[in-house]
A protein has these predicted regions:
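Cysteine-cluster motifs in flexible loop/terminal segments that predominantly coordinate metals
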Residues: 1-21
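Gly/Ser-rich helix-loop-strand patches that form or flank binding pockets
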Residues: 130
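A short, flexible beta-alpha/helix-coil linker loop
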Residues: 8, 62, 213-217
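N-terminal Rossmann-like NAD(P) cofactor-binding module of classical short-chain dehydrogenase/reductase
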Residues: 110
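N-terminal Rossmann-like dinucleotide/flavin-binding domain of flavoprotein oxidoreductases
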Residues: 58-106, 218-231
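Rossmann-like dinucleotide/flavin-binding elements
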Residues: 18-52, 91-102, 113-122, 126, ...
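Generic secondary-structure signature for well-ordered alpha-helical cores
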Residues: 3-6, 84, 88, 168
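Iron-sulfur cluster-binding cysteine motifs and their immediate structural context
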Residues: 2-6, 48-55, 61, 121
Length: 231
């Protein structure tokens, strides 16, 4: 499971109550920080969770905006409820330094600050027309009609899917789902499959997805239903 390491390991990984409660600081409220904070609190430790942003979730807040991945909203909702239920002291809009940790007199500090987007050292990378994936997914900057996406890994595919999609996502709109997959819920044809070409709402944009490897694009992606949609 993406968020529950105990799934299928219930007899191997147990969160037993601690005999020696500690004061714990967790820096970063992304997936790793949320998991650590909730488990530590569940075991009986006193946990303070810091994050520089205004909400918990880290890069899950990007993932939930990708068409078909809206279920990450529920993951974040679950963790918010767990933080409240377990009494974790959450401090948002807070940048942490050594003085912050020292002032809190914590017994342990867990650093879960995630990653910094890689910026390749190539000519023109600082041009105003160039943006990172965070701006592209959040829609904080305008995106042109012709786009080159450098990198064909999971993030490259997510960015491409996001900027080429138009309208509601099939994951949250039944009518859109039926059109994209060519399904007739009235079961007029056999099996409920309409027999027509699926209709996918596409943005008026051309995208070139680039990678350095000579292998087929997408070959390194996990073989899961999350990547079954053809761009």
């Amino acid at each position: 499971c993406l968020v529950n390491p105990r799934a299928c390991n219930e007899t191997l990984l147990n969160y037993n109550p601690t005999d020696n409660p500690k004061s714990v600081a967790v820096v970063g409220a992304g997936p790793a920080g949320l998991a650590y904070a909730t488990v530590a609190a569940e075991r009986g430790h006193r946990v303070t969770l810091f994050d520089a942003s205004a909400e918990v979730g880290g890069q899950f807040n990007l993932a939930k905006q990708v068409p078909g991945k809206e279920e990450f909203h529920e993951t974040i909702r679950y963790y918010k409820k767990q933080l409240e239920k377990l009494g974790v002291n959450v401090k948002l809009n807070t940048r942490v330094d050594a003085d912050t940790i020292a002032a809190g007199n914590f017994d342990h500090t867990m650093v879960a600050t995630g990653i910094v987007p890689r910026q390749p050292n190539i000519p023109g990378i600082d041009h105003p027309m160039v943006m990172g994936y965070i701006d592209a997914i959040n829609g904080t900057r305008p995106i042109g009609k012709k786009v080159a996406v450098i990198g064909a890994g999971g993030i490259g595919f997510d960015v491409t899917d996001t900027i080429t999609h138009d309208g509601p996502s099939a994951a949250v709109d039944i009518d859109v789902f039926a059109k994209e997959w060519g399904v007739d819920f009235e079961n007029h044809p056999r099996g409920g499959v309409t027999g027509v070409e699926p209709v996918v709402a596409k943005a008026d944009r051309e995208v070139w997805l680039m990678q350095r490897k000579e292998t087929k694009v997408g070959r390194g992606l996990g073989k899961t239903t999350g990547w079954t949609h053809r761009l």
